[in-house]
């Protein structure tokens, strides 16, 4: 007679159970743009364990300046963070502890980034990358191991946000230099094959100047059109990358973020005719297209409405906390705020640096 043993009978007595790490909090990196052509961009670091915010964080660790007008920051993987330093014409790489670990120096006038963990994709307003020249702007593909540009694709004039969905890059063309150069504003989102770096087609949104960052919730992109600051009003575009169809809304989403399901937007509408700003706080459900006034709860919405010059909004993918900044005068120190989804503050108001424009969270586990 044969007896079959259960799998547990074969397990060693000294087997150690696997314990999943527990999220205990998150630190923040705030990328302060400084003033254009002043070479005073900075990183600020908020330590959630100590409650201390450190300005000039990058410089204190590396003994050098970050550079002139850092325009985007992105966590590429667990060990690498990329910073697009626009007017210094470099992409600076750091580890999460702040130590510099290389740079890419042949993508001038760089703007916005996305990544699949293996490659970094970055837009540029420039007309040159290494020995290649372009009539308009382009997207560069960078190997994150070597930090070398491996391919480029010419797109429209002055491309801004770039996002990746199912092997395709979606590039928001602006034509933002139309006021000073001999071309029109752009209205298109360009679709590029991320593998071959060939342009596939353009999606004409009918809205000009697709400027500022875009947020991505699954297949949906939230894109800002800021108009021409005169007679052409700003809009928000929500694109479904599966069908490449879109909805258009009659308000801007200059600063936008997502929890993976909805978009939370703060729109800044400026008019050269009046010299005034109007601000909008909206929540968009991309699935059914509905829009509601306000963001998350009354406490957060009212705080956002009290800001002098809102300059960034970011929702943590780890905690669901929402963080935002106030640039105030654009020439002196700005401020950082953090709230839980129920409207309770994460910390007291934090003084950062000039034009705090980009935020990422670093999760902490035990």
Residue ranges and their predicted role:
Residues 18, 65-74, 108-117, 157-166, ...:
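Repeated scaffold domains used in trafficking and secretory/extracellular systems
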Residues 30, 83, 122-124, 171-172, ...:
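Residue position within the beta-strands of beta-propeller blades
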Residues 35-39, 84-87, 128-137, 178-187, ...:
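Short, solvent-exposed loop/turn segments at conserved positions within beta-propeller repeat blades
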Residues 43-47, 135-144, 185-194, 235-240, ...:
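Beta-propeller blade signature
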Residues 52-65, 98-105, 148-153, 198-205, ...:
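A short beta-strand motif characteristic of beta-propeller blades
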Residues 154, 159-270:
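Acidic, serine/threonine- and glycine-rich low-complexity intrinsically disordered segments
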């Amino acid at each position: 007679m044969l007896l079959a043993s259960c799998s547990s009978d074969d397990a060693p007595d000294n087997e150690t159970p696997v314990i999943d790490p527990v999220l205990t909090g998150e630190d923040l990196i705030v990328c302060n743009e400084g003033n254009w052509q002043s070479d005073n961009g900075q990183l600020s670091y908020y330590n959630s364990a100590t409650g201390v915010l450190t300005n000039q964080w990058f410089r204190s660790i590396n003994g050098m300046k970050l550079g002139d007008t850092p325009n985007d920051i992105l966590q590429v993987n667990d060990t690498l963070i990329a910073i697009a330093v626009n007017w210094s014409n470099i992409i600076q790489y750091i580890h999460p502890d702040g130590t510099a670990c290389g740079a890419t120096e042949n993508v001038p006038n760089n703007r916005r980034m996305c990544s699949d963990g293996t490659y970094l994709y970055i837009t540029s307003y420039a007309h040159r990358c290494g020995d290649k020249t372009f009539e308009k702007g382009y997207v560069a593909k960078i190997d994150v191991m070597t930090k070398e540009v491996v391919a480029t694709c010419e797109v429209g004039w002055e491309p801004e946000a770039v996002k990746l969905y199912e092997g395709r890059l979606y590039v928001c063309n602006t034509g933002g230099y139309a006021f000073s150069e001999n071309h029109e504003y752009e209205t298109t989102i360009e679709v590029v094959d991320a593998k071959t770096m060939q342009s596939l087609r353009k999606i004409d949104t009918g809205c000009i100047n697709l400027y500022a960052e875009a947020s991505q919730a699954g297949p949906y992109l939230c894109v800002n059109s800021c108009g021409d600051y005169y007679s052409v009003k700003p809009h928000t575009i929500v694109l479904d990358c599966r069908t490449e169809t879109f909805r258009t809304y009659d308000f801007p989403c200059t600063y936008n973020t997502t929890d993976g399901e909805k978009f939370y937007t703060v729109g800044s509408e400026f008019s050269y005719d009046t010299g005034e700003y109007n601000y909008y706080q909206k929540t968009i459900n991309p699935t059914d297209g509905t829009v509601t006034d306000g963001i998350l709860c009354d406490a957060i919405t009212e705080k956002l409405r009290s800001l002098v010059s809102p300059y960034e909004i970011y929702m943590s993918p780890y905690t669901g906390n929402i963080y935002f900044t106030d640039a105030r005068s654009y020439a002196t120190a700005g401020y950082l705020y953090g709230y839980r989804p129920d409207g309770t503050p994460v910390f007291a108001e934090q003084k950062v640096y000039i034009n705090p424009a980009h935020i990422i969270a670093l999760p902490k586990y035990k």
